[in-house]
Amino acid sequence: MSIPNNLRYSEEHEWVKTEGNEVVIGITHFAQGELGDIVFVELPEVGATIEADEPFGSVESVKTVSELYAPVSGKVVAVNEELSDQPELVNESPYEGAWMVKVELSDASQVEKLLTAEKYAEMTNQD
């Protein structure tokens, strides 16, 4: 699967899509592939504050449990409730159906500090 050019990426394998003063966050195709079949997703409550580089949830796969690290700081304004009933969406559609949270940014400049698709591809040795 190609790496979408319209997103930014963290070194912890989260992606960020900017929508005005909000961002949508999920995990990358590379990350879900490394984790294997996802069986459970734990996400914060709407209204919670998340801090860049700090854990904000976790994903459990048949192999392991992995923390999700916030690529930006802000207030959670929406959570993808479908993932509680269908965690496998993370494997099936990491960039579309399996977004995890929407966050109102506290500092929009944090997005610009994230990796471009090209830099993320280099980091993960993907074409």
UniProtKB/Swiss-Prot annotation:
Cofactor(s) of this protein: (R)-lipoate
Keywords: Lipoyl
Alphabetical list of Pfam families matching this protein: GCV_H
InterPro entries according to UniProt: 2-oxoA_DH_lipoyl-BS (IPR003016), Biotin_lipoyl (IPR000089), GCV_H (IPR002930), GCV_H/Fam206 (IPR033753), GCV_H_sub (IPR017453), Single_hybrid_motif (IPR011053)
UniProt-listed SUPFAM superfamilies: Single hybrid motif (SSF51230)
Keyword check for Transferase: no
Lipoyl-binding domain residues: 22-104
UniProt modified residues of type N6-lipoyllysine: 63
Cofactor binding, per record: Binds 1 lipoyl cofactor covalently.
CDD domains registered for this protein in UniProt: GCS_H
Superkingdom as given in the UniProt entry: Bacteria
BP term (GO), one: glycine decarboxylation via glycine cleavage system
Gene Ontology cellular component annotations, sorted alphabetically: cytosol; glycine cleavage complex
PANTHER family named in the record: GLYCINE CLEAVAGE SYSTEM H PROTEIN, GLYCINE CLEAVAGE SYSTEM H PROTEIN-RELATED
Role summary: The glycine cleavage system catalyzes the degradation of glycine. The H protein shuttles the methylamine group of glycine from the P protein to the T protein. Is also involved in protein lipoylation via its role as an octanoyl/lipoyl carrier protein intermediate.
Membership in a protein family: Belongs to the GcvH family.
Subunit structure: The glycine cleavage system is composed of four proteins: P, T, L and H.
Name of the featured protein: Glycine cleavage system H protein
Organism of origin: Bacillus cereus (strain G9842)
